[in-house]
């Protein structure tokens, strides 16, 4: 960074697969075979065998009937929610959901859907909203792991509520590197998964996995699928190779190493996203700068990304971090605590 070597605690490369030799080799081979880009949308001439192979692998990995690729995870949420939205549809969204879900809900509203936000992880509030809209076609959408706090949605309880009110449950699995995929049917509720290829898998792209009928609908209706160039062969091949690593003994070992890192930095925390909430923007910026002086890149997150008064350091851990790097981070955080964040 600016001529200095620093250790990044800002990347979403949770398992370190962007640098995995098998993943890199797959991208190179795909580029040599199919070219650097797809050249067109999937419904014109942009589809390559690697796209279909990856979609099949995602469906198998996620335990779903089928899956469809999008250029990014952001585009996947936009395409899914805009397609689900329409007159007579009510979408219920956690207030701390990712921006892609928020914008997808806006597109759904433009298509005639009603959108209600429920308080963060407040199942009673959600239950009240669901009951108030009985008779409508209802959708509940949530992050599985929330991107700023690193906390986890109670999928089983959400599914029970959805089953009770005949609602579809959509879960954004973007940051869910340590949790097993939800089943297609949880406590009687149909579960649709949205995911990204850019975090756990170290590539670029997004997907929706769910019932075959929904995937077919998205292929024919989702504008962020139809009217955009297909994902590159390199990214698709890299993601496919990464899935195979994740499903192997090596993948399990990487996940266990990540769990161990989390336990050293924040015992009991459920995800590799660890917030250090400092309150005001100045304190967060000063703490980030102090860590940078120590060779540790930890970003300060401020409004409007987070609420006023909750500015923070956002630590993102990776299995690629060494034990010494984790030790340096722990020591630096203790120093900040002793110095009052300055």
Predicted regions: what is each one?
Residues 1-36, 167:
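N-terminal "arm"/small-domain region of PLP-dependent enzymes with the aminotransferase-like
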Residues 17, 21, 29, 33, ...:
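PLP-dependent enzyme catalytic core of the Aspartate aminotransferase-like
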Residues 17-18, 179, 186-187, 195, ...:
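Short beta-strand-to-turn element immediately C-terminal to the catalytic PLP-Schiff-base lysine
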Residues 25, 30-73:
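Conserved N-terminal alpha-helix of the aminotransferase class I/II PLP-enzyme fold
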Residues 80-99:
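Conserved PLP-anchoring active-site segment centered on the Schiff-base-forming lysine
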Residues 115-171:
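Active-site phosphate-binding strand-loop segment of PLP-dependent enzymes
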Residues 196, 200-269:
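PLP-dependent aminotransferase class I/II
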Residues 252-295, 305, 309-313, 317-319:
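Conserved PLP-binding catalytic core of the aspartate aminotransferase-like
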């Amino acid at each position: 960074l600016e001529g200095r070597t620093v250790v990044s605690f800002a990347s979403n490369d949770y398992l370190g697969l962007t640098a995995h030799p098998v993943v890199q080799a797959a991208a190179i081979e795909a580029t040599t075979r199919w070219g650097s880009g797809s050249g067109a949308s999937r419904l014109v001439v942009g589809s390559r065998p690697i796209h279909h192979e990856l979609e099949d692998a995602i469906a198998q990995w996620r335990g779903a009937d089928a899956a469809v690729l999008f250029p990014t995870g952001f585009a996947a949420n936009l395409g899914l929610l805009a397609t689900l939205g329409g007159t007579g549809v009510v979408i219920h969204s956690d207030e701390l959901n990712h921006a892609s879900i928020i914008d997808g809900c806006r597109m759904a509203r433009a298509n005639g859907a009603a959108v209600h936000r429920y308080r963060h992880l407040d199942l009673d509030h959600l239950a009240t909203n669901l009951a108030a809209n009985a008779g409508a076609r209802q959708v509940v959408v949530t992050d599985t792991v929330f991107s700023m706090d690193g906390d986890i949605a109670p999928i089983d309880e959400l599914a029970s509520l959805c089953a009770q009110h005949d609602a579809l449950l959509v879960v954004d699995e973007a940051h869910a590197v340590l949790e097993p995929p939800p089943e297609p049917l949880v406590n009687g509720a149909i579960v649709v998964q949205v995911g990204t290829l850019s975090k756990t898998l170290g590539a670029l792209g997004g997907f929706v996995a769910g019932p075959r009928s929904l995937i077919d609908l998205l292929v024919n209706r989702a504008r962020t699928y139809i009217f955009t160039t297909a994902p590159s062969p390199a990214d698709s091949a890299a993601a496919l190779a990464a899935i195979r690593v994740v499903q192997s003994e090596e993948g399990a070992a990487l996940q266990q190493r990540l769990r161990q890192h989390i336990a050293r930095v924040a015992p009991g925390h459920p995800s590799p996203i660890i917030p250090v909430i400092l309150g005001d923007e100045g304190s967060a910026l000063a703490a980030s700068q102090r860590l940078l002086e120590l060779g540790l890149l930890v970003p300060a997150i401020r409004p409007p990304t987070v609420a006023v008064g909750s500015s923070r350091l956002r630590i993102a851990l990776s299995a690629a971090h060494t034990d010494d790097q984790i030790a340096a981070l722990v020591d630096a955080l203790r120093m900040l605590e002793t110095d009052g964040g300055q």
